[in-house]
């Protein structure tokens, strides 16, 4: 560091003002803190984006190893008569650690220098000035030179150190590159001392605000900057204009006729990224929505729970319409326990593994009804369930079901169940609604809950099937009762999931470990296997579908329609339904219902 004229500092003492350079060890005073050991460094890119006062230096603090802008009147050299006094001002552990850290740096600077270099990167003080020119409409062709200069140099990097106050000299270090890399070539140092012009509106300030993208305007700016090196008088851009002066001086000092400068593209992009608003960062950092993994049925796997049950298969033939997530798992267990099964699915390829396992495949639902004694249906929504019964080649195309049983396992509303039951009875059939409550994993382990209503004789005939796929089975009486109970249970599940997702999203904003929250939750009386499982999925970001989010939102919609008919107010369920609808719009329709966490988090 070099000395300059005497100035009066904040303490009233008269001392020599120092012009600091990178790697100068100093004492720095921040508001609210005692003087702290630090080092002058080149500012990192994220610090460049912050507004700062004039006459500030970027300081690296030992101990905490972070960066901040400090005014020059709050900086003193580390070595001096004041060192002993300042070292005794504070004795907390953090201060002692900082003193130890700087002493280690004096002995061996390698570790700290490496950390500072990683944070700050290669010094390029022209980056911000060039960025401003691009922002103000300067043509990119005038920023990035495409041809080499007359003497083979690729550009000039000017490093300005010192105070921009009036009357102070400016030390300009000009690294003239005679090869391809300005970092490795020797530096030629030039001293340029001069007085600043008064802070009045200059020609440069006017030309910077001129027409965007015009080559003529760009030429005016360069000419004006050469005529008036003080640059614009705007206080907020004073610091940036100092870098602009240095670039102009460097161009004049170099032997290149064009003086074109290269802009570090990566540095510019990083500077732009540092200026993004927090909401923009959250939006851009949102995870990419990927398709959930395709669910492949492993026909060779066997559930230990199912193997322990003493199941005697019925001699009747069971038809199954729909081989979706739940349907395929149920059919697999029925085949494994020795039941005779006939299957149909809209996508015929899904039937192939079951055909290889011994099931008979039919072309239409009507063909399945002809070949089976009891027909199960498990599709995704009420409309699909109705289409299979009343549609073309549907169940009722036979006209006479000959006392066959039809079991509706799709999640439907009570009115739809009553309509299907009425149609089956009119065609001389028997009807049972058997709502299944549980996840795909519970279905694979035979741990579902069956809620049945309708014809009691059908319920008895399906005893072996229900024992295969469920741990508990309930007969609830008339048609519609089972649908109501199932939708009520789904309401509890949906509201609980949204509450869990919002709570974990809040913990994530506090930077609290989600796994810690779940571990503590497991010790409370609120715990439940379902919430624990969903919480772990949210913490891991594992949204492979056990119960698709679209199915959960469908159930909530059915609940609200059912409540509307009764004039029953359900405000919390309504909000929960909107949350799931929004999550569907984000692209998580086919993911697990725990993906609602993504919506709460972002």
From Swiss-Prot:
Disruption phenotype: RNAi-mediated knockdown results in ectopic MSL-binding sites on autosomes of male larvae.
Amino acids binding NAD(+): 319-333, 411, 554
Chain intervals for the UniProt region annotation (Disordered): 162-262
Residue ranges, compositional bias (Polar residues): 176-188, 204-217, 224-233
GO molecular function term, any single one: DNA binding
Keyword Phosphoprotein: yes
One GO term (biological process): transcription elongation-coupled chromatin remodeling
Signal peptide start-end: none
One GO cellular component term: polytene chromosome interband
Phosphoserine: modified positions: 8, 10, 224, 228, 243
Key words of the record: Chromosome, Phosphoprotein
SMART domains hit by this protein: PWWP
Localization in the cell: Chromosome
PWWP domain sequence ranges: 22-81
Alphabetical list of Gene3D superfamilies matching this protein: 2.30.30.140, N-(1-d-carboxylethyl)-l-norvaline Dehydrogenase, domain 2, NAD(P)-binding Rossmann-like Domain
Segments for region (Dehydrogenase domain): 309-602
InterPro entries: 6-PGluconate_DH-like_C_sf (IPR008927), 6PGD_dom2 (IPR013328), 6PGDH_NADP-bd (IPR006115), GLYR1_PWWP (IPR035501), HIBADH-like_NADP-bd (IPR029154), HIBADH-related_NP60_sf (IPR051265), NAD(P)-bd_dom_sf (IPR036291), PWWP_dom (IPR000313)
Family, per entry: Belongs to the HIBADH-related family. NP60 subfamily.
Entry text on domains: The PWWP domain is a H3 reader and strongly binds DNA.
Function: Nucleosome-destabilizing factor that is recruited to genes during transcriptional activation and colocalizes with a subset of trimethylated 'Lys-36' histone H3 (H3K36me3)-enriched regions. Binds DNA (in vitro). Facilitates Pol II transcription through nucleosomes. Facilitates male-specific lethal (MSL) histone acetyltransferase complex targeting to active genes on the X chromosome. Stimulates the acetylation of 'Lys-56' of nucleosomal histone H3 (H3K56ac) by nej. May have oxidoreductase activity.
Annotated PANTHER family: CYTOKINE-LIKE NUCLEAR FACTOR N-PAC (PTHR43580:SF2), OXIDOREDUCTASE GLYR1-RELATED (PTHR43580)
Quaternary structure and interacting proteins, as annotated: Binds to mononucleosomes. Interacts with male-specific lethal (MSL) histone acetyltransferase complex at least composed of mof, msl-1, msl-2 and msl-3.
UniProt-recorded name of the protein: Cytokine-like nuclear factor N-PAC
Organism expressing this protein natively: Drosophila melanogaster (Fruit fly)
